[in-house]
Amino acid sequence: MDVFVDGELESLLGMFNFDQCSSSKEERPRDELLGLSSLYNGHLHQHQHHNNVLSSDHHAFLLPDMFPFGAMPGGNLPAMLDSWDQSHHLQETSSLKRKLLDVENLCKTNSNCDVTRQELAKSKKKQRVSSESNTVDESNTNWVDGQSLSNSSDDEKASVTSVKGKTRATKGTATDPQSLYARKRREKINERLKTLQNLVPNGTKVDISTMLEEAVHYVKFLQLQIKLLSSDDLWMYAPLAYNGLDMGFHHNLLSRLM
């Protein structure tokens, strides 16, 4: 369909200007003027109708098909977007909270497992230490019993041995008759050794083996002294005191004179 351009419209209006064409009104027929004016008015009306149809078709194509606002509740697009964002944010928040709860439960479970393992390890360690201490006590007890005859040289060692023996008896480590008899026998031997230490000169200052050797020499000295003192002729040769020296000279003298 033809559309008027700006220049054509002005020229057409100039052709129908009554001021310029007043002299030719009478010459042109009246029906010709009416036909031209009706043609111009129809053309304008048709052009406006075409523009209205195009604009209505364009909006009808864009709005109902691409953006169906009528189908939306309220027909408000920003409100719909805001509600969608809020629902999406709530879903993300709830999922994040669930993940945090799962992580906390897992951490609590792991911590409980660690505590249980530590308690089990501590109990096992205590049992091992107690068993080792019992073994050490038994070994110390056996060592004291075995060495009571050779290392109880002074009063303190003898008292410690007797105290330990009483402690073992109260604990019930030796409850059979044989062990009780052996313990009593050891106690009697320790008492006699203590008495012998007090009789032998310097017996409390040496160990058991040295003390027993000195006791043998001291007994020989006493025998020689008794023999010499009992003789009427040799009493002046009898030794007066035991000084730990060799008594061979006195024995030779006694055998030679007797």
Swiss-Prot record:
Domain bHLH span(s) in chain numbering: 173-222
Chain intervals for the UniProt region annotation (Helix-loop-helix motif): 187-222
Residue span of motif D-box: 98-105
Induction: Induced by jasmonate (JA) treatment. Induced by low phosphate conditions.
Polar residues bias locations: 130-152
Record localization: Nucleus
Record's keyword annotation contains Nuclease: no
Domain of life: Eukaryota
Summary of the knockout phenotype: Strong reduction in root hair number, density and length in seedlings.
GO cellular component, as recorded: nucleus
Tissue-wise expression: Expressed constitutively in roots, leaves, and flowers. Expressed in root epidermal hair cells.
Biological-process GO terms, alphabetical: positive regulation of DNA-templated transcription; regulation of DNA-templated transcription; response to auxin; root hair initiation
UniProt entry keywords in alphabetical sequence: DNA-binding, Nucleus, Transcription, Transcription regulation, Ubl conjugation
GO MF term (any one): DNA binding
Coiled-coil stretches: none
Region (Disordered): 119-178
Role this protein plays: Transcription factor involved in the regulation of root hair elongation. Is sufficient to promote postmitotic cell growth in root-hair cells and is a direct transcriptional target of RHD6 and RSL1. Involved in the regulation of root hair elongation in response to low phosphate. Controls root hair cell growth by regulating the expression of genes encoding proteins involved in cell signaling, cell wall modification and secretion.
Protein name: Transcription factor RSL3
Organism this protein belongs to: Arabidopsis thaliana (Mouse-ear cress)
Gene behind this protein: RSL4
